[in-house]
């Protein structure tokens, strides 16, 4: 895996490709939110698991805008299944406490749960609950 800072104005979150007989995943960290970077990583891992890197295809993840829709939808479903293996059946309200409960029930961080709920259109992107989500750098600083 390789990290390359996002290009100014660029829209690339990640790329998966092959070099000799090995897959390579490149992440830009674009957006910096931990949930977004984690999903980009899992999306590119799904391309690798599905063997796309072996076909001489470079898989570029630009916020879901690249690649044929059928392939990208399958890759997104696989990546999402790794985050929420049992799917998502929201039962709590969407207050911070409700999201924390839902995240705990699903074994993910509240930041990841917020990102999934936003991606599913269940809570808006401009939601108050997402304003203070940690960046990747902030999240890594808490690991010890």
Identify the meaning behind each predicted range.
Residues 1-144:
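Active-site hotspot residues in diverse enzymes, especially metal/ion-binding acidic/histidine motifs
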């Amino acid at each position: 895996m390789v990290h390359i800072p996002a290009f100014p104005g660029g829209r690339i979150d990640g790329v998966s490709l092959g070099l000799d007989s090995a897959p390579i995943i490149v992440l830009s960290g674009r957006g910096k939110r931990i949930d977004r970077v984690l999903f980009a990583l899992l999306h590119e891992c799904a391309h690798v698991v599905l063997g796309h890197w072996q076909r001489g295809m470079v898989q570029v993840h630009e916020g879901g805008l690249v690649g044929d829709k059928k392939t990208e939808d399958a890759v997104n479903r696989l990546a999402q299944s790794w985050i929420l293996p049992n799917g998502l059946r929201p039962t709590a309200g969407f207050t911070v406490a409700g999201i924390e409960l839902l995240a705990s029930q699903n074994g993910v961080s509240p930041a990841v749960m917020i990102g999934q709920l936003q991606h599913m259109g269940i809570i808006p992107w401009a939601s108050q609950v997402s304003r203070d989500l940690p960046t990747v750098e902030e999240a890594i600083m808490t690991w010890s």
